[in-house]
A protein has these predicted regions:
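Short, surface-exposed loop and linker segments with low hydrophobicity and enrichment for Pro/Ser/Thr
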Residues: 22, 27-47, 194-199, 272-284, ...
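Catalytic core segments in nucleotide and nucleic-acid processing enzymes
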Residues: 203-207, 212-372
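Secondary-structure junction/capping motif
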Residues: 76, 144, 179-187, 200, ...
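Interfaces and regulatory segments of ATP-dependent nucleotide/adenylate/phosphodiester-chemistry enzymes
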Residues: 4-188, 328-372
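Hydrophobic/aromatic-lined pockets within catalytic cores
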Residues: 157, 161, 196, 214-218
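A short, highly charged nucleic-acid-interacting micro-segment common to nuclease
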Residues: 38, 43, 190-211, 231-234
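Short N-terminal helix-initiation segments at or just after the protein's N-terminus
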Residues: 181-192, 222-232
Length: 372
């Protein structure tokens, strides 16, 4: 069988199980922990890549997923990860990061076997320890690779379905509120401010701005380009900012937004000037949107560059201030804006906007619309 065929067989076997068929309680606990460790998804993806390599080539050692190790028992775990797992994970909406585990700081540049006597430096420590123990369980024939892979998929499928059930329940609650008085602009500001105040919310200011163009783009005769991945560097994407805006019917960027979860500094302004100078086409304005306070001296410095940049305006906006002004300016579109923001939040990968953050937003919106 090909690796793709192996994956489909493992999936079918996992889907047919209602409970674990692993008798060993310690192994069962280990795989459950690795699969359900939400703070770091590299462990389960590493485990799946190594198991797939073992199932495809039974002679290899699942603890040797690096060709640099050498010998007939080593293999490229990254090749299995990127060539087969990425598509499989996406097609089946498995709750795992969309990028390979082998490029994470803990797992790249390794040239030795992943044995339990060599600690991997990463957090949580227990995740890597249990992952290595599972690989050793397979290497020492304490459990078959296919049985462990099926159990891994069974847990991931259960997690996916649990997550979907929670989302469906929250969305159903929101639908019951449809037809009632829509939230005021100020209530929406409060709602999104509460969301921005949550942990791990660094992606949200990007969505605050992007939602404005989704809701009002046609009236502005402008559109925002599709967002780049949250962890994509400007040098990789060639983008000017986190949100890039074009005029309708034109692909040239005229406005760029850069989001900051901290104060904007003069160095940030200088970096923007360099990007503006290197841009293939002249833009009209470059706007920083920050969740921190705006330093008046830095704002003045940005304003002073208008003539030096030949008419490109650089300014610093407060994120909540931007939102409040937009909602009052387009008051009739406030519900469209809120729906656009919700859609963007829910469509982001969990690596950018975590599942907890998505559920928090729906809960906050339900509470706001019900008057709780």
């Amino acid at each position: 069988m090909t690796p793709d065929e192996i994956l489909q067989e493992m999936l079918a076997r996992a889907a047919a199980l209602n409970e674990s068929n692993i008798a060993d309680a310690e192994i069962r606990e280990r795989v459950d922990y690795v699969c359900r460790c939400l703070s770091n998804r590299a462990g389960v993806r590493l485990l799946m890549a190594c198991l797939l390599g073992k199932l495809d080539k039974p002679h290899v050692d699942p603890r040797k997923p690096y060709t640099e190790i050498g010998g007939k028992q080593s293999f490229s775990g990254r090749a299995y990860d990127e060539s087969y797992l990425t598509r499989f994970i996406n097609e089946n909406r498995l709750p795992i990061n969309q990028t390979t585990a082998f490029l994470t700081p803990t797992l790249r540049n390794i040239n030795h076997s992943l044995t339990t006597n060599r600690e991997l430096v990463g957090r949580p420590r227990e995740l890597y320890q249990k992952t290595l123990e599972l690989l050793e369980d397979v290497a020492k024939n304490r459990i078959a690779a296919d049985v462990l892979f099926v159990e891994t998929l069974r847990i991931l499928l259960a997690m996916r379905d649990e997550k979907q059930a929670r989302m469906d329940s929250l969305l159903s609650t929101l639908k019951h509120a449809e037809g009632s008085l829509p939230l005021s602009s100020e209530a929406i500001v409060t709602l999104i401010a509460q969301h921005l105040a949550c942990k791990n919310a660094s992606r949200l200011p990007v969505l605050v701005v992007a939602a404005a163009y989704e809701a009002a783009g046609a009236r502005l005769t402008e559109r925002a380009l599709p967002l780049n991945a949250h962890n994509a560097a400007d040098l990789q994407t060639g983008s000017l900012g986190d949100v890039e805006v074009c005029l309708l019917g034109d692909d040239a960027v005229v406005t760029a937004y850069e989001m900051k979860m901290k104060r904007v500094t003069r160095d940030d302004i200088d970096s923007a000037v360099i990007k503006i100078a290197r841009a293939p086409q002249r833009i009209h304005n470059y706007l920083f949107v920050t969740t921190d306070i705006v330093d008046p001296s830095v704002a003045a410095y940005a304003a002073s560059l208008y003539e030096k940049t030949d008419g490109v305006e650089i300014a610093i906006l407060d994120c909540i201030g931007f939102l409040r002004h937009f909602l009052h300016l387009f008051h009739r579109l406030r519900t469209d804006y809120l729906n656009a923001y919700q859609r963007l939040v829910l469509n982001e990968p969990d690596s950018a906007v975590g599942q907890t953050l998505k559920e928090v937003f729906l809960t906050l919106r339900q509470a706001a619309e019900s008057g709780d």
